[in-house]
Amino acid sequence: MHCPFCSTEETKVIDSRLVSEGYQVRRRRECTNCHERFTTFETAELVIPKIVKTDGYREPFNEDKLRRSIQQAVGKRPVSEDDVEKSISCIIHKLQTTGEREVPSKLVGDLVMDELKKLDKVAYIRFASVYLSFENINEFTKEIEKLKKSQK
């Protein structure tokens, strides 16, 4: 790493510590030339994969689209904006940690379903009705029964 004071390429690490719940490393460095000390922070850069639609079309991940879908499902339900943001962060983190460059849109939908199931059962059913393309009341009933069984 270059010294920010004298631009020498040689620096040595004096101290390393985990910060930000272990997602970042703080390093104290010393320049071997001018002996100035400075701090650096290292964070892994995780990329969000592209989304592959069912028709094969590929598009960049759209966080706003995800947010709108979840907000529509939780509309007029007792779910805080903070809980919605936590769910969005969790979904994004799971997508980043797949290690894949592309993921099917079904994976995103399934992750949303998992988060909504934890967040609010009515919001889960609302989202499921669109995502799973319910065509009649029997399909609604089956999904509600599955939800009831999973609560036991």
UniProtKB/Swiss-Prot annotation:
One MF term in the entry's GO annotations: ATP binding
Which keywords has UniProt assigned to this entry? ATP-binding, DNA-binding, Metal-binding, Nucleotide-binding, Repressor, Transcription, Transcription regulation, Zinc, Zinc-finger
Q: Which residues belong to zinc fingers classed as unnamed?
A: 3-34
Q: Which Pfam families match?
A: ATP-cone, Zn_ribbon_NrdR
Query: What InterPro entries does the annotation carry?
Result: ATP-cone_dom (IPR005144), NrdR-like_N (IPR055173), RNR_NrdR-like (IPR003796)
Q: What intrachain disulfides are recorded?
A: none
**Top-rank lineage group of the source organism:** Bacteria
Q: Where is the ATP-cone domain?
A: 49-139
Which cofactor names does the annotation list?
Answer: Zn(2+)
Cofactor binding comment, as recorded? Binds 1 zinc ion.
State the Gene Ontology BP annotations. Answer: negative regulation of DNA-templated transcription
- Does this entry carry the keyword DNA-binding? yes
The role this protein plays is:
Negatively regulates transcription of bacterial ribonucleotide reductase nrd genes and operons by binding to NrdR-boxes.
Identify its protein family. Answer: Belongs to the NrdR family.
Query: What PANTHER family does the entry give?
Result: TRANSCRIPTIONAL REPRESSOR NRDR
This one is known as: Transcriptional repressor NrdR
Q: Which organism is it from?
A: Actinobacillus succinogenes (strain ATCC 55618 / DSM 22257 / CCUG 43843 / 130Z)
